[in-house]
Amino acid sequence: MRKIQMKRSQTMSTIITHRQFPHYHKYTMDLAGRPLTLEVGKLAELANAAVMVTYGETSVLCCVTAAARPRDGIDFFPLSVDFEEKLYAVGRIPGSFNRREGRPGEKGVLTSRVIDRPIRPLFPHDFRNDVSVMCTVMSVDHDCSPEICGLIGTSAALAISDIPWNGPVGALKVGLVDGKLVFNPTSEQRKVSDLDVTVVSTGKKVVMIEAGANQVPNDVMFEAIRMAHEENQKQIALIGQMVAEIGKPKFDYPHADFDEELFQKIVDATMDQAKAAMATDDKNVREARWNQLIEKWHQLFLEDYPEMDKYLDEITYKFQKKIVKAWLLEGHRVDGRQKNEIRPLAAEVGVLPRVHGSGLFTRGQTQVLSVATLDTLSANQKLDTIWEETEKRYMHHYNVPGYSVGEAKPARSPGRREIGHGALAERALLPVIPPVEEFPYAIRVVSEVVSSNGSTSQGSICGSTLALMDAGVPISAPVAGISCGLIQDDDGSFTTFIDIQGVEDFHGEMDFKVAGTKKGITAIQMDLKNDGLTMEIIKNALDITYDARCQILDQIMLPCIAEPRPEVSKYAPKMITMHIDPDKIREVIGKGGSVIQKIVAESGAKIDIDDDGTIHIASPDAESCAIAKKCIDDIVFVPEVGQLYYGRVVRLMTFGAFVELAPGKDGLVHISKLADKRIEKVEDACKVGDMMWVKVTEIDEKGRVNLSHKDAMKEIRAKEAAGEIIK
């Protein structure tokens, strides 16, 4: 039998040629100088829609599915968004025990939230069918963001699917490199960029902004958002073409049940009591009053409407929103504040006695206790993900226990909201954290929300600043955060208001969070419940949040602590940083780590060594650090020709004396170099244990060191005659 051999490339091409994809379509465009391709009809045919997005060499498969029937007994839209990070996308095997990807990492959770926020408001408000969005990262080119691919692919998949949705949207990142705004910056550009803002928009409005920035001014941030919105129209046009050519008709769905007649009767009968119940700055009082009002509704209407209880949550929401909206459009708020008035503020540092730094920030009934901890760089968080970042030196974690909102519920591991808010505060402080060369510590801040009534994420930003300054971390500038809300009337007029509390967040249309210094913005996160923001609203929000954060800094934070403590806490580890020749690292570590383990045992210090020869020594006390440094200095010591050293005589020979310059490092003083005059015996000039000055005169090709006591003393006498002090 004749054996037929076929090359791999021939086999693959045969498979592709003979496999039929009758519904396959491919759409391409140029996006920021790189090719963007959207493919439909080749993968995941059983999903409502699936789009493979390829941008450069980054590939993300975006699939959307919807349940055929609505979920019973719920008053919310059950949307789930998952961003799956596959390590094969970057050519790596997971480091877990079973070598499988586990639960999503922090960056995966944050990207899921970035995709969720712009698409959620565009679903019908009474849609109750489960909808799943899954973006699987299959290949990563670090010059082309998987996050942007996920946003574009999700938009395209929802738009061409039969799922009711009022898209499409376009998405773009903007950087600031050498003072110029850059669309979708490359990996190298991101490393030097002062801005990383993701902007998602529809054909007319902006629906999502997520930003980290190095104290960027308002006008630069606004211009980046405006330019991104305009550029997004190209993607929207391409997806519009896809919808026209291959889009499916949207399916009909049962609209959420609601008794409008009952609602109107309740409004007419109890409007005055409802306004009285809402008009307070105390969350607990408001809720107690409203519960009493519900009892009155039962007395008035339960007999005629026996099923009214199933509508109570929706009635409460609509009724409260009606009141809050009317008041805000008239220029006042539920707690009596003006629209740009901040709730009462308080700040305190040094709250906890033995921690490295702590800060308590209070704004109305929102209260956050932030605690800073310093450790050696070995405590940096190691990251095993598809992203370029491999470790984090500054970490912020955010916790919201049940008692903070007056609820009796058990403690749970952090959810997506906690991870998202923690990352926002982390991003807000990152630009002012000192570089590792100036402050060689790993830094962790934990923000405990002990009372929650709106804007807790912004409270954690202010609390983090206080805790870091109390810990002696030399941040370059204090950072404050504030949120801005929005109410729009049917005629398009709008009102923005500052420092939203819980009830305003719940019933408002926007939560526009902005953090920064007096110099500029460090972070933005925008959540919406409407169909988007105009440029006028965005500019207004940027302006009023700047004024508000400056007010917070000037009135409460800086009077509390004007600048970072001059030294770290006495309970924080003491740190020394030194640099050695990288070729000497092996000598410091020793065979099997024997040398460094001995140094650690003798000194009690903790030692971290970088590949570039940077060594960080940490210990609870300075003496241990000094001992460890001395040991390392001795190991890496290399004598220099022409230099003077003060050493101990360790051995006598007939031809000279050996003098120890450092432990294990000695040189020979020939008998002719021991004294100014001729001597017959070495013992006539010195004995073992004597200390003497020597000068390095030569280091031969074998590394042997030749010394001279005679030359050293001659140089010392000359320096003393010139008035120099010899140490």
Give the location of each predicted region.
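Conserved helix-loop functional segments at active or binding sites
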Residues: 117-125, 160, 351, 376-379, ...
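Single-stranded RNA-binding regions, centering on S1/OB-family and related RNA-binding modules
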Residues: 571-573, 582-727
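Extended amphipathic alpha-helical scaffolds
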Residues: 11-67, 252-388, 573-587, 595, ...
